A protein has these predicted regions:
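N-terminal leader segment of winged-helix/HTH proteins
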Residues: 1-22
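N-terminal helix-turn-helix DNA-binding core of bacterial DNA-binding proteins
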Residues: 17-55
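Residue-level signal for threonine
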Residues: 24, 83-84, 126
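Canonical helix-turn-helix DNA-binding module
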Residues: 46-78, 85
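Arg/Lys-rich, alpha-helical DNA-contact motif
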Residues: 93-132, 136-139
Length: 158
């Protein structure tokens, strides 16, 4: 059997694993939320995180242990959850990614399911695509007349 091209094909999961510093989408959600909750006081707690993510505290504890093993955070049983430097960096990047995707969807006038769609998309795009989306959002933010023209164009196509 001859190869289809010079590139190797992988399953979707393997493409994700090949990404630098791979975290599962669920782990990314935890790191992002810990970052959000920790911004004011520098820490959060299991129950606060469970409430914010709509999960049970034992699920939080299990994930926190994994993230602690990855050196992204410090956690002592029944204590504070504190992001380490790599966790802070990752959390900041994840929140930025979330905000960029959300801004893009708002630019497209997505209203129904905005948070859900943002969450789905943010885990599936790479940095090159994210940078392109960020540039596009920034371009339209700085050129409101063109955004108006774009929205008029979209309206005429419906």
């Amino acid at each position: 059997m001859s190869p289809m091209s010079d590139q190797d094909f992988y399953t979707f999961r393997e493409y994700l694993r090949k990404e630098h510093e791979y975290l599962s989408p669920s782990a990314e959600d935890y790191v992002e939320m810990i970052y959000r909750l920790s911004r004011e006081h520098g820490f959060t707690r299991v129950n606060d995180l469970a409430t914010a993510l709509n999960v049970q505290p034992p699920s939080v504890t299990k994930m926190i242990q994994k993230l602690s093993e990855m050196k992204l955070l410090k956690y002592e049983k029944y204590g504070f959850i504190i992001l380490e430097a790599p966790g802070l960096e990752k959390g900041e990047a994840l929140l930025k990614r979330h905000n960029i995707v959300e801004s893009f969807l708002k630019l497209l006038n997505v209203k129904e399911g905005l948070l859900e769609e943002t969450e789905k998309i943010e885990h599936m795009i790479n940095n090159e695509i994210l940078c392109g989306i960020h540039d596009l959002v920034d371009y339209f933010d700085n050129n409101p007349r063109l955004l108006k023209t774009f929205n008029e164009y979209r309206t005429t196509r419906e």
